[in-house]
Structure formats: structure tokens, C-alpha cells
Amino acid sequence: MGGILVTGGTGNLGALVVARLREAGHEDVRVLSRHAPVYPVDLLNGAGLDAAMAGAEVVVHCATATRGGDEVAAGHLIEAARRAGTVRNIVYISIVGVDEVPLGYYRSKLAVERLLEASGLGVTILRTTQFHDLVARVSGSAAKLPVVLLPKGVRVQPIAAEEVADRLAELAVPAPAGRVPDMGGPETHALTDLGRAYLAARGIHRRVVPLPLAGKAYAGFVRGGNLAPAHAVGKKTFAQFLAARGAS
């Protein structure tokens, strides 16, 4: 098997994927990021992509930017894969609800899905629910105020990033699988309840106040567009995530 590229390979998810691929015995795993020592690549302008892509057979595309640029980055990745002529499968990590919740970041992820599907290249797309880490970050940010304000009526189904990395490593094979079944966490809870659990685990004494919001994106979350109840395949619960994390 040829080389495997992991974009965003120094990020939280990408680093986990890289570790799993190497543990599985893959010798040519190429870590791509702007600051990677061997394959420094800037996806926003394509610099370094051709050298990194040479002879590669699989790409696991984990790189993303909440502030925009994902579509441009995907375009450069697709063109580099075409030039290389050896790439048989681009594995892309997406989000459950990108076609249900009109959030700017979600729209960008959906646009990348469509670019990949229209590229003529072999593609595998995995959508997952939000990571435990994201719920913890949202709760931690909200806890900086005297009263913790979290969106009212929003339910989440968080999943462990490690479990998603396991699945991405499984999918990183030359044969593309198209859109594969979604991955959701094992439990669904109100975000406010998980916020309270986070505060209790950290020993933070704050009152959580459900805050009603406006807009189509908020309505999409309230409708449950971000959930995958039929695909609750995750194992680690948010409570277990908090227990393993401790007070950090």
C-alpha cells in the first residue's frame, strides 16, 4: 500500500488518526500541517502539497478551520490529488447535521462534501456527532461568566474523538466507500445538563441558565438536526470522559 496523508495531522483528531495508523503497521504515514517538520503544507494556498502527495494512495482529510477557508483548502487538495495520479481514496471527516442545520461552519463542511463527491476521485465521507471535547470547551467558556448561559432546548449526542479516530483509520484503505453510516455518541442529553455535569466535575459552582436564542441555525439544533439516534455506536459516555479527564 502506498503512502497515507493525514491533513491536520498535528490537531486533536488528526494526531489520534496518525497514531492509530502507525500502530496498525503503516510505515508511510505523512503528517501534513503548516508546522509539520517533514511535510509543511499550507492548504489555503496549496504550498507544499505536490511534494507531500507524491506517491500517496490515501488521504485522510482532518484539517478544518471554523473561521472559513475549508472549501478553498479542499479545492487545492483535490487538484493536488489529480496531479499526483496515485490517490485512490480521500477520507473526509464531516459532521452530522451539515444538511439540516444552516450554521455557517456546517454549510462549509457540506460544501466540501459536495466538492469531493463531484471531483471524480475516490471518496469516503464519515459524519459524526459533536466530540466530548467540544461540549467541554463550550461549557468551560460559558463558565467564565457569573451565570452559565447555555442554549435552551438543544440536545447533543457527544462521541469520543478516539473512537472516531479508530473508524477513520479503518476507512483509510485504497478502496473508497462513499458516504458511510454516521457515528453518534452512546447517549443524548440536553446541553444544559451536560454543562452542569462539566461544572460539577470541575468543582465550579455556577448556576446554569437555559437561554432561548433566535435564528434558523438554532431552530435546526432544537429540531435535533445534529443528532444521529439510529447510529448511537459510540461507547464512551460524557460522564466517563469527564471522569477520565479529571479536574484538568
Q: Where are the regions a protein language model picked out?
A:
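SDR active-site strand-loop-helix element
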Residues: T7, L32-R34, C62-A63, I90-I95, ...
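A conserved pocket-lining segment of Rossmann-fold NAD(P)-dependent short-chain dehydrogenase/reductase
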Residues: T124, R137-I159, E163
